[in-house]
């Protein structure tokens, strides 16, 4: 009896088509709604990507949630090490920093601003960027407002010079009037100086020129001059923006699951792309387009 049982166990674990799940730690600094939503979608997508072939003897992935306690980052790293995960999903900048304190474990990150400052090149570390490339934003804008050819923007050279430097090359068919300042107080007047010179005003994700003090100036200019206002955040549509081209968090979670499977299945190593562009969603504020008397070329997007 024992001999037969032993043979059965050996045969079971030697099946070439058996698919084992992975041990994954989801590391985050809070249990916010967005973190939980991303975690759920990531886990569901990962389960869908388990190889299904042969006898399909499937062991599901084991996902352990670790929430960072302020001041106890060392305790978090020790707990993760005790789990011996195959991969860490880090949600947010603090989570990425803590994840990189755990040696040798591959990391996939989401919701991290400027992650390139934290990347460890000695192991697989990758993630989805929070920055939508300028060309993607401009191409989406053109899809809805094809008659726009002159675009105005105000920017801080210390924060956004890299974005501005590439505009002429990514969209040579457009004219850009880019006004530089490092002083928040100058932003309203610079916006006003664009009157009659542009067909669209563009808000950059620049803390000097786009903030709670300057938002009203953008909206007033758009309304007075009957031109659309392009922004990077859905929330700013409620403050008078006309179109938002922003990252899609649900699709980012699915994209992260794909990156994780690439690492776990050894399809990539330390040479993998450190940062990939995010999937985007475009939202039109149809109330504002009506108020501005502007027609749009693509009406598939729902009202905001």
Please describe what each predicted stretch is:
Residues 1-4:
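Positively charged n-region of N-terminal signal peptides that target proteins for export
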Residues 19-304:
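Short hydrophobic alpha-helices and adjacent helix-cap/hinge residues
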Residues 7-14:
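Bacterial N-terminal signal peptides
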């Amino acid at each position: 009896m024992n001999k037969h049982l032993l043979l059965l166990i050996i045969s079971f674990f030697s099946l070439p088509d058996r698919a084992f799940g992975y041990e994954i730690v989801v590391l985050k600094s809070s249990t916010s709604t967005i973190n939980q939503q991303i975690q759920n979608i990531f886990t569901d997508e990962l389960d869908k990507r388990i190889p299904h072939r042969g006898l399909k003897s499937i062991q599901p992935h084991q996902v352990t949630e670790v929430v960072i306690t302020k001041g106890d980052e060392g305790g978090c790293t020790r707990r993760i090490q005790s789990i011996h995960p195959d991969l860490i999903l880090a949600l947010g900048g603090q989570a990425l920093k803590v994840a990189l304190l755990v040696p040798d474990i591959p990391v996939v990150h989401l919701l991290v601003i400027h992650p390139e400052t934290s990347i460890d090149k000695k192991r697989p570390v990758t993630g989805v960027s929070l920055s939508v490339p300028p060309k993607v934003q401009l191409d989406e804008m053109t899809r809805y407002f094809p008659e726009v050819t002159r675009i105005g923007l105000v920017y801080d050279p210390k924060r956004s010079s890299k974005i501005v430097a590439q505009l002429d090359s990514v969209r040579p068919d457009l004219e850009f009037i880019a006004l530089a300042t490092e002083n928040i107080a100058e932003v309203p007047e610079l916006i006003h100086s664009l009157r009659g010179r542009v067909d669209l005003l563009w808000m950059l994700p620049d803390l000097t020129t786009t903030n709670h003090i300057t938002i009203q100036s953008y909206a007033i200019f758009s309304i007075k001059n009957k031109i659309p206002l392009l922004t990077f955040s859905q929330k700013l549509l409620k403050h008078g923006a006309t179109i938002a081209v922003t990252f899609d968090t649900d699709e980012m979670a699915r994209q992260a699951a794909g990156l994780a499977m690439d690492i776990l299945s050894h399809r990539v190593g330390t040479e993998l792309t450190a940062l990939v562009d995010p999937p985007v969603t475009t939202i039109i504020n149809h109330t504002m387009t009506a108020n501005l008397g502007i027609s749009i070329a693509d009406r598939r997007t729902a009202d905001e």
